[in-house]
């Protein structure tokens, strides 16, 4: 594969010099990602996995398209270089982008950082999310990137189907959420670009400044509802450190991390919103994550997961479903 890829890239991207070096990027659960370096240029390759067990997943073409469109906005994204749909080079469709230089923080608690710096990181995250949701998606050619309105109804149906397709067990908590969510739908008329996985670990920050230089991992992006992103972005406030690195139960004031209400107020101020997230939005976000974790467990069982801890992460499905039920009022 490496030899084919090197020959392809040198033919498709002008000026690449020296032998190609390729290194897998650890930590991802979905689309395999690699650093691809030449003597004079550092790139990133992102591809579909060899197998695709879940419908509509691993859409690298959509990732490429939305980031290419956002290049014309104030939302920071890597520069897209090419998309290759055929399987003749690396076995599955893939795209190439410029490699950004900066810091990625996988843990919401931001260990080893001064309290004042933690606050700056959180406020930058909220401001970046607000910029995304204010983008005129029609003006940048994304009118057909998803349906307009009715986002939560469609998403509940989608993730319910994913659960029924992928589940390896029964879950009373998931079934309770499947029953409750459609009966408690909020207004669905609003439409924005929805990242679908807007969390701290999918942001790259400037090497020294509290500034986002790249929003990464757009696999789940679509035209959706901004409050879906907002609720998902706040999941860490509702989950324990052992539950995928949540911050529930930590002394947030001592850490310099804003309480959820303060964090949301900052987002609302930057986005110009007058309404906010509700119990429904949090329950939906946790339900969706429970189904995603179950899908990771399925891929782990088949040996087709990008990260080595996929079996462990898949076990979190039960924990997130339980947290989702905490928002259910029958």
Language model: regions and residue ranges:
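Active-site activation/catalytic loop segments of kinase-like enzymes and analogous catalytic loops
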Residues: 228-271, 285-303
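ATP-binding pocket architecture of kinase catalytic cores
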Residues: 19-193, 207-209
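Catalytic-loop of the protein kinase fold
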Residues: 193-195, 200
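Hydrophobic residue at the +6 position relative to the catalytic HRD Asp in the kinase catalytic loop
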Residues: 203-205
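Activation of the activation-loop gatekeeper triad in protein kinase-fold domains
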Residues: 216-221
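Juxta-kinase regulatory segment immediately upstream of eukaryotic protein kinase catalytic domains
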Residues: 1-16
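Helical subdomain adjoining the active site within ATP-dependent kinase catalytic cores
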Residues: 273-277, 291-330
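All-alpha amphipathic helical-bundle segments outside canonical DNA-binding/catalytic cores
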Residues: 146-147, 273-285
């Amino acid at each position: 594969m490496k030899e084919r890829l090197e020959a392809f890239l040198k033919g498709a991207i002008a000026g690449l010099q020296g032998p190609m070096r390729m290194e897998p990027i650890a930590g991802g659960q979905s689309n395999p990602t690699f650093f691809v370096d030449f003597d004079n240029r550092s790139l990133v390759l992102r591809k579909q996995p060899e197998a695709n067990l879940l419908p509509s997943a691993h859409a690298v073409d959509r990732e490429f398209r939305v980031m290419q469109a956002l290049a014309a906005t104030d939302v920071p994204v890597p520069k897209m270089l090419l998309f290759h749909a055929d399987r003749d080079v690396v076995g599955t469709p893939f795209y190439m982008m410029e490699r950004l230089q900066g810091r990625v923080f996988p843990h919401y608690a931001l260990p080893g950082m001064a309290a004042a710096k933690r606050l700056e990181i959180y406020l930058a995250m909220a401001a970046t999310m607000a910029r995304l949701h204010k983008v005129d998606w029609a003006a940048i050619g994304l009118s057909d990137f998803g349906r307009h309105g009715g986002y939560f109804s469609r998403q509940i149906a989608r993730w319910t189907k994913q659960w029924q397709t992928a589940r390896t067990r029964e879950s009373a908590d998931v079934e309770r959420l499947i029953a409750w969510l459609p009966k408690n739908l909020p207004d669905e008329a609003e439409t924005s670009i929805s990242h679908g996985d807007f969390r701290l670990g999918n942001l790259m920050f400037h090497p020294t400044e509290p500034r986002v230089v790249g929003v990464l991992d757009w696999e789940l992006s679509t035209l959706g509802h901004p409050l879906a992103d907002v609720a998902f972005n706040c999941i860490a406030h509702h989950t324990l450190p052992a539950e995928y690195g949540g911050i529930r139960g930590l002394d947030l004031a001592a850490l310099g991390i804003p309480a959820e209400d303060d964090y949301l107020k900052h987002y609302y101020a930057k986005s110009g919103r007058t309404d906010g997230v509700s119990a429904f939005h949090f329950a939906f976000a946790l339900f969706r994550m429970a189904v995603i974790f179950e899908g990771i467990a399925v891929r782990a069982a088949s040996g087709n997961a990008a990260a080595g801890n996929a079996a462990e992460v898949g076990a979190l499905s039960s924990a997130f479903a339980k947290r989702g039920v905490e928002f259910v009022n029958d």
